[in-house]
Regions:
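Active-site beta->alpha N-cap acidic-glycine motif
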Residues: 1-38, 43-48, 56, 65-104, ...
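Active-site-adjacent pocket scaffolds in enzyme catalytic domains
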Residues: 3-17, 82-198
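Short acidic, glycine/proline-rich loop/turn micro-motifs
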Residues: 48-52, 152
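Short, well-ordered coil↔helix boundary/capping segments
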Residues: 181, 210-217
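Histidine/acidic-residue-rich catalytic or RNA/ligand-binding cores of hydrolases
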Residues: 133-134, 215-221
Length: 222
């Protein structure tokens, strides 16, 4: 049950149950390749009535429920009893990124420490090295420049989508190509900037989607 919400609710809907097996396989492959497994939590509740209202106890509840989903997925998916097990438990998660990068940092850090987490990836910063705040490593998304604009955009594909296409996931082919080109140049410039200065890790958020003809994933792959 999400904090302050009815049991079984989500702010972004639910995937097709037939996708659960595919996602288990994808997580298994990611783990086998050495990728970090972190939490983005459960219902993705943003805005005035979402995670901004949550207390530390609410975040602890959300983390406990996330752990339960990871560790007891067979219980909630009886049709997958014969599916190969995940090669990890919820205890491998040592941090997370909150929905929409929202929430009270103090409440979040308190809950993270109780959960044994060591990092938070929910803030936005500059092209900088991670730093320790409140006993946790803060690993922020980074503000980077988009070609032809004076504003800096958080290094996440969704933020680029809002800036470049008003949040719409569809566009004409020529618009898609321009978005891909501009995004690639933004990513490349940010990489060049850190390589020629403080050599901080460059963090580029990507939902592995096909928004605007796959422009963001294509730019990242390039």
């Amino acid at each position: 049950r999400p904090p302050g919400k009815q049991r079984g609710t989500s702010d972004i809907g639910f995937a097709d149950p037939t996708m659960v097996g595919t996602r288990l396989d994808s997580l298994t492959r990611a783990w086998s390749l050495g990728m970090e497994i972190g939490s983005h939590f459960n219902g993705h509740f943003c805005g005035a009535s979402g995670v901004n209202t949550w207390t530390s106890a609410d975040w602890v509840s959300e983390i406990d429920q996330w752990n339960d989903f990871v560790d007891n997925w067979r219980l909630y998916n009886p049709d997958l009893q014969d599916h190969p097990p995940l090669p990890f438990s919820s205890q491998v998660a040592k941090g997370g990124r909150t929905p929409c990068l929202e929430g009270d940092p103090q409440a979040i850090r308190s809950a993270y420490r109780q959960a044994g987490y060591t990092y938070d990836a929910s803030q936005v910063g500059d092209l900088q090295w991670p730093r320790r705040i409140g006993g946790l490593w803060e690993i922020p998304l980074q503000r980077i420049k988009v070609p032809g604009q004076s504003t800096l955009i958080a290094s996440m594909d969704f933020n680029f989508l809002v800036n470049q296409n008003g949040g719409e996931t569809e566009a004409a082919p020529e618009v898609c190509q321009q978005i891909e080109t501009d995004t690639y140049e933004a990513y490349r410039s940010a990489l060049d900037a850190v390589m020629s200065s403080n050599r901080a890790p460059l963090i580029l958020g990507n939902h592995m989607n096909d928004w605007v003809c796959g422009a963001y994933t294509n730019a990242l792959t390039r």
